[in-house]
Amino acid sequence: MLHRYLPMTEEDKKEMLQTIGVQTIDELFSDIPESVRFKGDLKIKEAKSEPELLKELSQMASKNANLKEYASFLGAGVYDHYAPVIVDHVISRSEFYTAYTPYQPEISQGELQAIFEFQTMICELTGMDVANSSMYDGGTALAEAAMLAAGHTRKKKILVSSAVHPESRAVLETYAKGQNLEVVEINHKDGVTDLDVLQSEVDDTVACVIVQYPNFFGQVEKLADIEKIVHQQKSLFIVSSNPLSLGALTPPGKFGADIVIGDAQPFGIPTQFGGPHCGYFATTKAFMRKIPGRLVGQTVDSDGKRGFVLTLQAREQHIRRDKATSNICSNQALNALAASVAMTALGKQGVKEMARQNISKAQYAKRQFEAKGFTVTFAGPFFNEFVVDCKRPVKEVNDALLQKNIIGGYDLGRDYKEHENHMLVAVTELRTKEEIDTLVNEMGAIQ
């Protein structure tokens, strides 16, 4: 057999060409000058059999540092967490895996209910009233929150803490430029937002203040103090939060946050180069009609049975593009499903235990670093990340660790000149005592 897969036969081609009124495929490219058309055969190797191809690809993949063979202490927004086995089984079912936006509720009840459950669990974690069906990732969720605030308050200035993830701030800058909004960064002090600087910057021109909880350095921000400053001028208070941390920390909603956003990656979504992720967006009832993205609501059908539908669709671009609250289109439904299944499998106590283990193992790692003579830069409370002064380029340290099958922490000098030679170390529930001890000992040996 010459070709294993036949996308179309010669008869199919002939019928398609006749339908559009041409005789040959070459006629489709008649607008391209002959002088620039490629002639001859491409220098492509001969086709391989499936076993040969699988062997070659496996050999190529074996060159990658994967988390089955390497202990990872790299976080900075993407974390190596446990995902219950059932997650992959459920999201691989064809009715979920291939489904698109469920515009027809009569044939999409399974997907709609799954999204509704995701929204419900996000509300429970964040302490907010309503959540959407997901965003692309935490960065776009943050930017969309700022756009909502600017539109609601009709103000042009956005204050964002420098302790917010640098990549999320970059996405915010991109959104703001197109809307002619001014983004002002509030410096951090001792690893958290400088409240004195924040107090001096908040005035009646500020649409919102954005902080991260825990922040990019792993530190837990003082949300109660920040909220008082923000709401003095009737600005909106936006908090970006790691949802897993909310299994242990007081939810932002309890501190008066107006919008809580973040990335659901810690729940069932693996680490992978470039994503995809799953942003979440939760807010109070006051902003329910301004929230971006899909919203699934619970209702009853003509027989009085419980059902689920897309609701408040007039906000969306497929209804009124020029009046839409956002131009975000397809949500991350499959990843939201993964997060839902992971949270459901863990249960409330499981999420709490997972968060507790992150805290306890990170605290153990901190103590071991200090015992080895390292300086842990910030003294405040943290969740599962903290900053270590390496006294030498972090890249050199990480290159050495990689030889020991360890993926080291994030090089803060990439984004903060004042934190050159500082490493952001992440310790999740998957890290063992032996792995933590090995990390500290290896770093101590090259200090």
Swiss-Prot record:
<dbReference type="GO" id="GO:0019464">
    <property type="term" value="P:glycine decarboxylation via glycine cleavage system"/>
</dbReference>
<dbReference type="GO" id="GO:0004375">
    <property type="term" value="F:glycine dehydrogenase (decarboxylating) activity"/>
</dbReference>
<comment type="subunit">
    <text>The glycine cleavage system is composed of four proteins: P, T, L and H. In this organism, the P 'protein' is a heterodimer of two subunits.</text>
</comment>
<comment type="function">
    <text>The glycine cleavage system catalyzes the degradation of glycine. The P protein binds the alpha-amino group of glycine through its pyridoxal phosphate cofactor; CO(2) is released and the remaining methylamine moiety is then transferred to the lipoamide cofactor of the H protein.</text>
</comment>
<dbReference type="InterPro" id="IPR015424">
    <property type="entry name" value="PyrdxlP-dep_Trfase"/>
</dbReference>
<keyword id="KW-0560">Oxidoreductase</keyword>
<dbReference type="InterPro" id="IPR015422">
    <property type="entry name" value="PyrdxlP-dep_Trfase_small"/>
</dbReference>
<dbReference type="InterPro" id="IPR015421">
    <property type="entry name" value="PyrdxlP-dep_Trfase_major"/>
</dbReference>
<comment type="similarity">
    <text>Belongs to the GcvP family. N-terminal subunit subfamily.</text>
</comment>
<dbReference type="GO" id="GO:0009116">
    <property type="term" value="P:nucleoside metabolic process"/>
</dbReference>
<dbReference type="Pfam" id="PF02347">
    <property type="entry name" value="GDC-P"/>
</dbReference>
<protein>
    <recommendedName>
        <fullName>Probable glycine dehydrogenase (decarboxylating) subunit 1</fullName>
        <ecNumber>1.4.4.2</ecNumber>
    </recommendedName>
</protein>
<dbReference type="InterPro" id="IPR023010">
    <property type="entry name" value="GcvPA"/>
</dbReference>
<dbReference type="InterPro" id="IPR020581">
    <property type="entry name" value="GDC_P"/>
</dbReference>
<dbReference type="InterPro" id="IPR049315">
    <property type="entry name" value="GDC-P_N"/>
</dbReference>
